[in-house]
C-alpha cells in the first residue's frame, strides 16, 4: 500500500477491482487544505483512460504485473500466439494488441514483452525499433528535393507510414513503434 502522494507514473494500482496504470500524477497544495493528487489512469483490461483525484494521504493498492520475453509464433483467429524460451505458448486477443498488430508478421524474430495479469496475457509490447520490408511505395518524383520530402509506403504487415523519398519497394527500413515513424533505411 502506498499513499496517493507516493504513486508515480508507471505504477499499477487496483481501483474498484480493476488494475489501472498511472500515466500522469499532479499534486496541488492550497493554503490550509490537504494536498490533492490528480491521477491520469489507463485501465489495463479495457484500455480506457480516466482522471481521478485523491487526498494526499489516501492509501492505494499498488500491484506488480508479470512480464515475459516472447516471440511471435502464429495467428489463430482471433488470437495471436506468442512463445517463450521454454516453448510455452500464450494467447493474446487481437483487440489487446492495439497498435502493435500492425507490426506483427509471420517469421518475425523480434522479442516482445507479454504482460500478464492473473496469469492471463493482456498485452504485448514491441521493441522500440523494428525492421520491416517496404512492400509498396510510389517511385520518387524527379526534381522534388526541397526540404524533407516524404511519401507514403506500405510495409510487410499491411500498415502505411510516411518514408523518405529515396526509399524504394523492397527496401528494409527501421520504424519507431511508439510513434509509427520512419527512422532510416537499413
Swiss-Prot record:
Localization of this protein: Cytoplasm
UniProt KW keywords: Cytoplasm, Elongation factor, Protein biosynthesis
Record carries keyword Cytoplasm: yes
Domain of life: Bacteria
Main localization of the protein described in the UniProt heading: cytoplasm
Sections of the chain in a coiled coil: none
Family matches, as SUPFAM superfamilies: Nucleic acid-binding proteins, Translation proteins SH3-like domain
GO MF, one example: translation elongation factor activity
SMART domains, per the entry: EFP, Elong-fact-P_C
GO cellular component: cytoplasm
Pfam family, one: EFP
A GO biological process held by the record: peptide biosynthetic process
Pathway assignment: Protein biosynthesis; polypeptide chain elongation
Function: Involved in peptide bond synthesis. Stimulates efficient translation and peptide-bond synthesis on native or reconstituted 70S ribosomes in vitro. Probably functions indirectly by altering the affinity of the ribosome for aminoacyl-tRNA, thus increasing their reactivity as acceptors for peptidyl transferase.
Similarity remark: Belongs to the elongation factor P family.
Protein name stated in the entry: Elongation factor P
Species this protein is from: Shewanella piezotolerans (strain WP3 / JCM 13877)
Biological classification of the source: Bacteria, Pseudomonadati, Pseudomonadota, Gammaproteobacteria, Alteromonadales
